[in-house]
Amino acid sequence: MKPAMSVEIGSLKLRNPVMTASGTFGYGEEFSQYVDLEKIGAFVTKGLSLKPRAGNPTPRIVETPGGMLNAIGLQNVGIDAFIQKKVPFLRSVNTPAIANFFGYTPDEYAELASRLDAIPEVAALEVNISCPNVKQGGIVFGTDPGCAASVVAACRAATQKTLIVKLSPNVTDIVEMAQACEGAGADALSVINTLTGMAIDLERRRPVLANVTGGLSGPAIKPVALRMVWQVARAVKVPVIGIGGIMSATDALEFILAGATAVQVGTASFVNPAAAQEIAEGMEQWLAERGIADISSLIGALEG
């Protein structure tokens, strides 16, 4: 008997718990020849802003032991080009597309949420709060509970769609951030975004990345991500989406046990473009082999 793999995130029903992570899967179309999109639960777009962004100068990606650093700088086509050039593809796919977006003031976030709310092909919104608040001296929204709550509340007022908030791990207390976002109206929380790191070229005595620091992702961050998912899932009532170093079905299932309702696959897609599909299939096979009837029975089932 095939196990039941479907899960719910807010009002969003997913055929299985595996999504792709923002910034690692383009706008979906780029990977559609490598992945059967109808074998994964959902895909998340590159982060969108009101205006197009060229991103940071190169080099902006570097491989590290157990992962990679990126300082892409949120390069994207902007909301207008997204609507004109990227949305038509979304109509052709029977898999939920989640739009990730960011701004530099609460008003910018709200405007983007409102515009994305009006697009039927966008199934849900994911808010990237790992951006500086230009109105408050550059403090990163995702490192201050009050700032984060103000962004989430502004977005909540602008959309009826499922609102997911992606949390930064670069904080003292992730539970405090999670509870602030839940209180402001988040329907779900993505845990975690990248950790801040850097790489140095010894011979040149210079940073490898032109931006100096970047976001660390991949297997190196998995233990931190698991711990944070476990902490957050026990402290909030909304679903948690686990992210961080998921390279296999086993990795994904560990996040489910820790309390995640769904997972996102990111860096693995750079290694193997079909990673998300293979992980989803591997999870189903693991349950079937053990006679587990429903994935939901594993959510938060960690013992001890």
Swiss-Prot record:
InterPro entries: Aldolase_TIM, DHO_dehydrogenase, DHOD_1B, Dihydroorotate_DH_1, Dihydroorotate_DH_1_2, Dihydroorotate_DH_cat, Dihydroorotate_DH_CS, Dihydroorotate_DH_I. Pfam families: DHO_dh. Pathway: Pyrimidine metabolism; UMP biosynthesis via de novo pathway; orotate from (S)-dihydroorotate (NAD(+) route): step 1/1. GO terms for cellular component: cytoplasm. The active site is at C131. Substrate binds at K46, N70, A71, I72, G73, L74, N128, N193, T194. Signal peptide: none annotated. This is Dihydroorotate dehydrogenase B (NAD(+)), catalytic subunit. The gene is pyrD.
